[in-house]
Design a protein with these regions (language model features):
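Aromatic-residue-lined binding/catalytic grooves and analogous aromatic/hydrophobic interfacial grooves
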Residues: 1-6, 43, 144-175
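Single conserved hydrophobic/aromatic residue that forms the stacking wall/gate
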Residues: 179-188
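Flexible, polar/acidic helix-loop-strand segments at domain edges
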Residues: 1-26, 33-39, 50, 54-57, ...
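Structural helix-adjacent loops and short alpha-helical linkers that scaffold large soluble proteins
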Residues: 42-48
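C-terminal structural cap/anchor segments
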Residues: 48-131
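C-terminal/domain-terminus segments
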Residues: 130-150
Length: 188
């Protein structure tokens, strides 16, 4: 049985209205994309670290908050466990990642990628489509496993939804594409 939405009705919701402007692409995202490109060895015109730090600073500027330099210097803070005040037995979660904020030049390429994508996720809030695309592509940032996976085993609880299922008409009329896509998913 899933968690009932009414259980959390006293919590806040994003403060957006239909008439509000919605961000589609921000400067911080550009910096994080360049950081990832530099990390992969592409000529981005700078280092992964420089673009990563620029992305964090641009995100702070966009939100009109101070403290970016102090934030970037924090080599101690790691993701905290989530303690659900309403349903702790079912919804508490302790992150597996120990990623910090401060850039660590000695870290593995994978850890650096996790750091970049995690900060990109934060900077892009509330653009869920960007976060979902990055998560599908990289597996970062670490997200809570599904509390109520009602897919009958079709969707992995920890890996979660990676792509939308093909409609029946596509399965019946274009099976070659379907098998190619399934093979690509299994290779990831």
């Amino acid at each position: 049985e899933g968690v009932k939405p009414a259980t959390y009705s006293g919590y806040s919701m994003p403060n957006y209205e239909q008439k509000d402007d919605m961000l589609m692409f921000c400067a911080a995202e550009t910096a994080f994309l360049r950081a990832e490109g530099a990390l992969r060895g592409w000529d981005m015109g700078g280092s992964a670290r420089d673009f990563y730090e620029q992305g964090v600073k641009l995100s702070f500027d966009q939100r009109k908050v101070s403290g970016a330099d102090e934030y970037l210097a924090n080599a101690v803070a790691v993701p905290e466990p989530f303690i659900d005040p309403v349903n702790p037995a079912k919804c508490n979660y302790t992150p597996k990642t120990k990623i910090t904020i401060a850039w660590n030049e000695g870290a593995s390429t994978e850890e650096k990628l996790e750091r970049i994508i995690t900060q990109k996720w934060i900077a892009n809030f509330p653009l869920g489509f960007e976060g979902w695309a990055d998560y599908r592509r990289t597996g970062y940032p670490e997200v809570f496993p599904s509390v109520s996976n009602l897919s009958n085993g079709v969707i992995d609880t920890n890996r979660q939804l990676r792509r939308l299922p093909f409609p029946l008409s596509e399965k019946q009329g274009n099976s070659c594409l379907l098998y190619t896509s399934d093979a690509a998913d299994e290779a990831r």
